[in-house]
């Protein structure tokens, strides 16, 4: 398994955390230098996600986060990788993580590497809808289908066809359709045409900040993105008014899709309920 950890080159404390977390378990990994607001970021947006530069409801840091994932996918495609595991540098790993991340036989035995799929390794401790699937358990963890939103991109495995799917669509999406990268991957924001997202349960990883919040403790690492989002909230609310008229042009079709999705989720929730995906 190729494990890539997105991290700022200057983030010494976080990189030490990752080296210790992965190293003690013998999990191979490599850092992928996260993008920062810069001319390089602007060039990569123009090449891969041109609408993102015009999306003023996202901060520059959120755009850099989005593009760090997109550029990593493009690199994986260029290298011909069938799939890649992606992590962020504040991730915590659960029990026996090395059995999932230091080898990939389990993955190829359960998933068609030539198809589009995501295996979500992370939990955000939100109540979500998951539907049982026929994928066999591995090391006391199951792989139900994720049927509701579940934020976060701290840990996931994405196949080549899924990377290609997102990059092809990101390249043509208008600005008003673009959201934060976790919204694009793990909600019904746009039709993923049946591409499955499997939620590992119990989760194999979580963000240190959200685990600390879940335990009502103080975070040791914090979240640069969360800080940036907090600073941007007021700015977003004012900008939102400017976009309401433009968004109204395509509103009715999207609203119909949302209503259908809400109805589908209501039926699934009635059948399966909502649950917090645990971490261990």
Swiss-Prot record:
Example of a GO MF term: glycosyltransferase activity
Biological process terms in GO annotation: lipopolysaccharide biosynthetic process
Keyword Iron-sulfur appears in the UniProt entry: no
Native organism: Neisseria meningitidis serogroup B (strain ATCC BAA-335 / MC58)
Name assigned to this protein: Lacto-N-neotetraose biosynthesis glycosyltransferase LgtE
Family: Belongs to the glycosyltransferase 25 family.
CDD domains: Glyco_transf_25
Pathway: Glycan metabolism; lacto-N-neotetraose biosynthesis; Bacterial outer membrane biogenesis; lipooligosaccharide biosynthesis
Transmembrane segments: none
Signal sequence residues: none
Keywords: Glycosyltransferase, Lipopolysaccharide biosynthesis, Transferase
Role played: Adds the first galactose to the lacto-N-tetraose chain in lipooligosaccharide (LOS).
InterPro entries in the cross-refs: Glyco_trans_25
EC number in record: 2.-.-.-
Enzyme class: transferase
């Amino acid at each position: 398994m190729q494990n890539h950890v997105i991290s700022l080159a200057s983030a010494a404390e976080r990189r030490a955390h990752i080296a210790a977390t992965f190293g003690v378990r013998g999990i191979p990994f490599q850092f992928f230098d996260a993008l920062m607001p810069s001319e390089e970021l602007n060039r990569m947006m123009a090449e891969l996600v041109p609408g993102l530069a015009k999306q003023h409801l996202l901060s520059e840091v959120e755009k850099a986060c989005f593009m760090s994932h997109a550029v990593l996918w493009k690199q994986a495609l260029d290298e011909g990788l069938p799939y890649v595991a992606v992590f962020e540098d504040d991730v915590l790993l659960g029990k026996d993580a090395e059995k999932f991340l230091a080898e990939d036989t389990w993955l190829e035995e359960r998933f068609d590497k030539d198809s589009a799929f995501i295996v979500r390794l992370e939990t955000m401790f939100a109540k979500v809808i998951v539907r049982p699937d026929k994928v066999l358990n591995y090391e006391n963890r199951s792989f139900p289908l994720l049927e509701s939103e579940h934020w976060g991109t701290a840990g996931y495995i994405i196949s080549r066809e899924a990377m290609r799917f997102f990059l092809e669509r990101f390249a043509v999406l208008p600005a008003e359709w673009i959201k934060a990268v976790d919204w694009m991957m793990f909600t019904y924001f746009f039709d993923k045409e049946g591409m499955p997202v499997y939620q590992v349960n119990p989760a194999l990883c979580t963000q240190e900040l959200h685990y600390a919040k879940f335990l009502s403790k103080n975070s040791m690492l914090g979240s640069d993105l969360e800080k940036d989002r907090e600073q941007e909230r007021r700015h977003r609310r004012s900008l939102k008014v400017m976009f309401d008229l433009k968004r109204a042009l395509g509103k009715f079709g999207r609203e119909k899709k949302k209503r259908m999705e809400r109805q589908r989720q209501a039926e699934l929730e009635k059948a399966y309920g909502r649950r917090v995906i645990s971490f261990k």
